[in-house]
Structures are given as C-alpha cells and as structure tokens.
C-alpha cells in the first residue's frame, strides 16, 4: 500500500514538471518564431522599396509604378530639402533662427515669473512714497517757519524805526485860531486908520483904533 501511494505521488509530481516544461518550451518556440534575424535587420512595411536599387528585386511591382509617378519624385525632392534644413538647424541654426526678444519684454517676463521681485518692487514703491511725503512735509514746515521769521523780523525792524524817530510836538489848533484872529483884527485896524487919515488929511488916528492899541 505504501509503495502504491508513493508511486502515485511521484507520477503526479512528474506530470506537473512535464506540464511546466512544456509551457516554457512553447513560449520559447513562439519567441523564436517572432524573432526574424537580428533586431537591427527588422524593417517596417512602409519602408519597403525606399532604401535604393538593391531592394528592387524584393519590392513588389506596384511599388515600381508608384515610384515612377512625378508626384513621388517631387515629394522625394522636398524630403531631401527638408532633411538638409533639419541638419542645419540641429548643428548651427538654432540660435540664428530664434527671434531676438527686446530687453523690455525679457525683463517683464522675468519679473512676472518671480513673485519675490514683485514684492521687492512693492516695498520700493512704498518707501519712495514715504520719502516723498516726508520731504514734502519738511518743505512745508521750512516755508512756514521762514514766513514766520520774516514777519517777526519786519515787526522788530518797524519797532526799532519808530523808536529811533523823535516825537513830533503836537500844536493846539486853538492857539493858531487865536493868533489868526488877532492878526486879522490888527490888519483891519491898520487899513481903516490909513483910510481915515487919507480922507481927513490929518495925522491923528481914530479914537477907536487908539483904544484898541491901548488895549493890546
């Protein structure tokens, strides 16, 4: 019984190993079928007949008709020109083909891209605004102080000028009026006396005028 059990176990193990080996063998055969020659020799179907006259023997007949058409020849010429242009651009024409941007656009693009520069610009503007406001305040204060000083200097100069001038004595109008009245009465008395003397022809004076003279 024991021998029968062991033989069945061995058979089952061998069957499993055979199955695994067959699976690996089938996968290996499939890989060998897919690999046709070296990887560098594998060509795409669209490239058939494009590599030169050596492949004309293997190329189909419809490819020859397609090659002989004038449209295909023009396309080939354009392809050669494009390849030459590409080679030039790859080796030496990259920097020449690029348009030169002006400095202002470069600066603006760099400033927009960096947030730190924007913050620094804002702080600079704030400081400049503060500086201008403080300078304006100082200018206003200086102008007001200078105007006050000029007014004070003018007041002091006026006071000194007035102190240096001598005081003019004030004359009473009453005295002038009295003196004017006395002078007028004496003149009138003289005129009347002269008229009296001319009329009478005598040197005597009028009694009224004598009384007036005695009174004065």
UniProtKB/Swiss-Prot annotation:
Membrane topology value: Peripheral membrane protein
Keywords, sorted A to Z: Cell membrane, Cytoplasm, Growth regulation, Membrane, Nucleus
Residues annotated as transmembrane: none
Biased composition (Basic and acidic residues): 108-121
Disulfide linkage: none
Record-level GO cellular component terms: cytoplasm; nucleus; plasma membrane
Domain CRIB: 36-49
Organism superkingdom: Eukaryota
GO biological process: response to light stimulus
CDD domains listed in its UniProt record: CRIB
Compartment(s) where it occurs, according to its Swiss-Prot or TrEMBL record: Nucleus; Cytoplasm; Cell membrane
PANTHER family (alphabetical): CRIB DOMAIN-CONTAINING PROTEIN RIC6-RELATED (PTHR46325:SF9), CRIB DOMAIN-CONTAINING PROTEIN RIC8 (PTHR46325)
Name recorded for this polypeptide: CRIB domain-containing protein RIC7
Taxonomic path: Eukaryota, Viridiplantae, Streptophyta, Embryophyta, Tracheophyta
